[in-house]
């Protein structure tokens, strides 16, 4: 029996011990992300959220870049712990979802509606948070 959205929300958790096998087909992940981008509301219908889904080699490449960058910036002792965390909790996964806010959209709204200009950056972050919440909850729903 399928969970309701409320049940999926209550059950949703961060998973840290992850593997490269996904219980959700890649096509379903793409569909979930597209539905969120299309349907999650945003202030002034700004639709400023941008999402990148990395799978396969692109996912691995990202986490190698992260490790190389951190290795150059932190001590060897700290890096060993960090590398273990990255390898066991992030790079070992099936894919990565990256969330961005298009600042050109925010700037355009600030110019168009100067009375609200100080609010648009915050509203943009609210929109990003709603996208993240919607996507992770829909992914939780699809696990059943």
Descriptions of predicted regions:
Residues 74, 104-105, 109:
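Membrane-helix exit/interface motif
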Residues 93-102, 106:
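Conserved active-site beta-strand-loop modules that form the wall/rim of enzyme catalytic pockets
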Residues 63-65, 107-112:
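Short, conserved acidic/polar surface loops in the N-terminal third of protein domains
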Residues 37, 103, 113-144:
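Small-aliphatic-rich amphipathic alpha-helix that forms the alpha element of a beta-alpha
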Residues 15-16, 99, 116:
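Sequence-level detector for tyrosine residue identity
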Residues 1-95:
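N-terminal amphipathic, basic helical "cap/leader" segment at the start of enzyme domains
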């Amino acid at each position: 029996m399928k969970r309701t959205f409320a049940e999926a929300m209550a059950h949703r958790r961060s998973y840290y011990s992850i593997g490269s096998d996904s219980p959700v087909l890649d096509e379903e992940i793409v569909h979930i992300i597209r539905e969120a981008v299309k349907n999650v509301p945003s202030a002034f219908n700004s639709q400023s959220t941008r999402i990148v889904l990395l799978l396969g080699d692109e996912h691995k490449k990202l986490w190698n870049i992260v490790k190389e960058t951190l290795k150059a910036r932190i001590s060897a002792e700290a890096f060993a712990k960090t590398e273990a965390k990255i390898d066991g909790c992030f790079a070992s996964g099936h894919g990565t979802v990256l969330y961005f806010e298009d600042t050109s959209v925010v700037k355009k709204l600030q110019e168009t509606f100067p009375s609200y200009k100080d609010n648009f950056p915050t509203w943009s972050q609210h929109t990003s948070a709603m996208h993240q919440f919607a996507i992770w909850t829909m992914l939780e729903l699809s696990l059943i």
